[in-house]
């Protein structure tokens, strides 16, 4: 659990709420997004000590990299700056906004760092260089090792001011890695930083799924021989093992509830059931002769998409959780799996077999219109949305046929490898906006 007592946050200047209402929020799901031009000069070491100079450099670089990862900020190259790094002011009175407008910036972030007595203070400000005013000012205090947390939190504040959502900066991504020869579940921060091992049983562990509050992780493990469900609290030593005869696989949490769906076969056929988070079967959800797997829920939890073989091949269906009425969603192609419902709207990312390879597509639930996001780069599978719906994590064999995890925009642009780890990495699952274990 994050020890928030180590990190103290104070507002530098209180601004009237009406000031922020004048900004038009950026639509982060817009595939034709005009990236926001922003400048992040080196921070100022306020007393000039060596630890401050190092912290100022690393802090500015980390903040720029963090914003750039979102794909909707255009970071102005520091080589284009008209001001010398050591003369860039921290407050509005010390800033020549024209110098920043002339190089194409619309916004400017400045920072000042103090390191003394084993503690760090960081002042961060966001300015609109066209309106020549400060939008946001924050002061953070903590240990030097807390610098990344300070930067993450400020980036969330910047995002909320400019887009209306705090973004992804406190989210995590769970995944499967074979680095030690077995399939273990790991979790890292949204940008691949700090990968941590979750399971340690030298067995096969699959299908990690986050609860809505980011505190619980459900997954399938073969540690006792057969596929059982494990429901584990990430910061406390407690949880549940769900083990019925047959298979117990593919968990998915119901949004806003301590309940999940999973595929079980204790009654013979592989059907989807609703369970409590403590492992009690509530009711059976599907009833068909074909295998039903891979449940995923709409943002309000009122509908469930899943994969079924009832049509003769794997296709995605949608069930109304109230009435039980089910309708087929995918019709194009003979193999469609791995559905992931966008947490903010009615689109579903999924994996389709096209041209002998697996590729990621997105389908509009209302219209049935599909868009291909990957093609001609190996197998691309297991898509998972970021909590704000702006990015998609997925696994791909595009590099030498070895499965790695990548992140791309919701429009399929700007794919980047997330992690550099031994072995293969598969099955990414993005957490809600805030997740435990950071």
UniProtKB/Swiss-Prot annotation:
The protein's name is Tol-Pal system protein TolB
The yes or no answer to whether the keyword Transmembrane helix is present is no
Q: Mention any one GO cellular component term assigned to this protein in its UniProt record.
A: periplasmic space
Alphabetized PANTHER family for the sequence = PROTEIN TOLB, PROTEIN TOLB HOMOLOG
Q: Which InterPro entries match?
A: 6-blade_b-propeller_TolB-like, PD40, Tol-Pal_TolB, TolB_N
The protein's matches in Pfam families, at most eight in alphabetical order, are given as: PD40, TolB_N
Q: Which SUPFAM superfamilies match?
A: TolB, N-terminal domain, Tricorn protease N-terminal domain
Q: Which gene encodes it?
A: tolB
Query: Would you identify the family this protein belongs to, as annotated?
Result: Belongs to the TolB family.
Q: Does the keyword Nucleotide-binding apply?
A: no
